[in-house]
UniProtKB/Swiss-Prot annotation:
GO terms for cellular component: chloroplast thylakoid membrane. Pfam families: Oxidored_q3. The lineage of its organism: Eukaryota, Viridiplantae, Streptophyta, Embryophyta, Tracheophyta. The chain crosses the membrane at residues 10-30, 32-52, 61-81, 95-115, 152-172. It comes from the Eukaryota. The gene is ndhG. Keywords: Chloroplast, Membrane, NAD, NADP, Plastid, Plastoquinone, Quinone, Thylakoid, Translocase, Transmembrane, Transmembrane helix, Transport. It catalyses: a plastoquinone + NADH + (n+1) H(+)(in) = a plastoquinol + NAD(+) + n H(+)(out); a plastoquinone + NADPH + (n+1) H(+)(in) = a plastoquinol + NADP(+) + n H(+)(out). It comes from Populus trichocarpa. Gene3D superfamilies: NADH-ubiquinone/plastoquinone oxidoreductase chain 6, subunit NuoJ (1.20.120.1200). NDH is composed of at least 16 different subunits, 5 of which are encoded in the nucleus. This is NAD(P)H-quinone oxidoreductase subunit 6, chloroplastic.
């Protein structure tokens, strides 16, 4: 946003305080529902930071994805679980946990070695030299699509895998 300097600075300080207070609420509040609402405040403040830095598409994506979907999913999972029954028979470490952590650690080490030993030169399909597009004619959404399919392809896939694992974990927790 093109705001005058003092108003922009005031909004930055106000949003920074909102982030700090919301983050403290996430960590320090004992009720998980209030903690999830504090997380929603933090995510809304982050999206407002994006609006202040003229990244309107990223701000809208932040609101839709994180506040609208992830935070609602967290609230649903917290409200779905009964805390007193969930921690009644809580064992710190079992054989299944050790086996699972061993398998996950070995898969992680295997993925890291495969990624570090792979030559990524031939994998990228398009390069910037082949794109003969005027920057003024391309919208922000198209620029984001171009960057996601070229420069940020691997991190984008990592994030999708992490979200898939989180979804499977939420389903497994809800079935218990």
């Amino acid at each position: 946003m093109n705001l005058p300097g003092p108003i922009h600075d005031f909004l930055l300080v106000f949003l920074g305080l909102g982030l700090i207070l919301g983050g403290l609420g996430v960590v320090l509040l004992t009720n998980p529902i209030f903690s999830a609402f504090s997380l929603g405040l933090v995510l809304v403040c982050i999206s407002l930071f994006y609006i202040l830095s003229n990244s309107h598409f990223v701000a809208a994506a932040q609101l839709l994805i994180y506040v609208g979907a992830i935070n609602v999913l967290i609230l649903f999972a917290v409200m779905f679980m009964n805390g007193s029954e969930y921690y009644k028979d809580f064992n710190l470490w079992t054989v299944g946990n050790g086996l699972t952590s061993l398998i996950c650690t070995s898969l992680f080490v295997l993925l890291i070695t495969i990624i570090s030993n792979t030559t990524w030169y031939g994998i990228i399909w398009t390069t910037r030299a082949n794109q003969i597009i005027e920057q003024d004619l391309v919208s922000n959404g198209q620029q984001i699509g171009i960057h996601l399919s070229t420069d940020f392809f691997l991190p984008f896939e990592f994030i999708s895998i992490i979200l898939l694992v989180a979804l499977i974990g939420a389903i497994a927790t809800a079935r218990q």
